[in-house]
């Protein structure tokens, strides 16, 4: 009987315990993207939330409920669309993080009538799929890699900024300060405003956001008015002399070119056309 009891214990340890671990604790999260792969994978649209007349948040499903996209913070994916028999690609930064999202990922997309990939995404119906590959990009945010991040965003260029801010807000050990200047045309164009304000509420001593509008629709608008100029950057973002500071820029090409010149005028080191992680001014 003693031998049978010993055998039973061995069976429990070898067979039963691993099964309990698997079903009680759950399967290990699996990253779907592989930087070593160069082929595109298909993911179905499972939800679409309309934010403005031409901008929506798109949620795409991953193969399994416990999968994560596998995208380092600050990097982007490449989306492919076949337009008139020709493959066209564009880069997008998901707003979701592996740390807080399983089974899906989210994209903030503004669709243009004359756009290629953005128009294709805007016409997707639930169940339709997109083809993506990645991760790609020269920026990979890590905890406390900078003491102060100055961010300049325009329109959907808020996506990588929001992703980085959310990562900082969720990490109790990350003490990085963030100052964001977010430019738009009208107040209704300010994307993710509630979500951004929620992040500020999580770390009010670290986060500061200033909104600028080209054309305010009301006289009591409390934010800034006009373009994001050198004076705006000087007033709201950290100076070039601040230790371990970095400026991040993402938005329409004209805005990016303008603020990039302004940062050089303000003493920041001029970056090369293709930004690198170590640059004092990084353009997504």
UniProtKB/Swiss-Prot annotation:
GO molecular function: cytochrome-b5 reductase activity, acting on NAD(P)H; NADH dehydrogenase activity; transferase activity
GO cellular component assignments: endoplasmic reticulum; mitochondrial outer membrane; plasma membrane
EC number: 1.6.2.2
Gene behind this protein: CBR1
Binding residue positions for FAD: 148-180
Location(s), subcellular: Mitochondrion outer membrane
Membership in a protein family: Belongs to the flavoprotein pyridine nucleotide cytochrome reductase family.
Function text: NADH-dependent reductase for KTI11/DPH3 and cytochrome b5. Required for the first step of diphthamide biosynthesis, a post-translational modification of histidine which occurs in elongation factor 2. DPH1 and DPH2 transfer a 3-amino-3-carboxypropyl (ACP) group from S-adenosyl-L-methionine (SAM) to a histidine residue, the reaction is assisted by a reduction system comprising KTI11/DPH3 and a NADH-dependent reductase, predominantly CBR1.
Regulation: Competitively inhibited by NAD(+). Inhibited by mercurials such as p-chloromercuribenzoate (PCMB) and HgCl(2). Enzymatic activity increases under anaerobic conditions.
Pathway involvement of the protein, from the record: Protein modification; peptidyl-diphthamide biosynthesis
FAD-binding FR-type domain boundaries: 38-142
Entry's transmembrane regions: 7-27
Organism encoding this protein: Saccharomyces cerevisiae (strain YJM789) (Baker's yeast)
Highest taxon, organism lineage: Eukaryota
PROSITE patterns attached to this UniProt entry: FAD_FR
One GO-annotated biological process of the protein: tRNA wobble base 5-methoxycarbonylmethyl-2-thiouridinylation
Protein name: NADH-cytochrome b5 reductase 1
Cysteine pairings via disulfide bonds: none
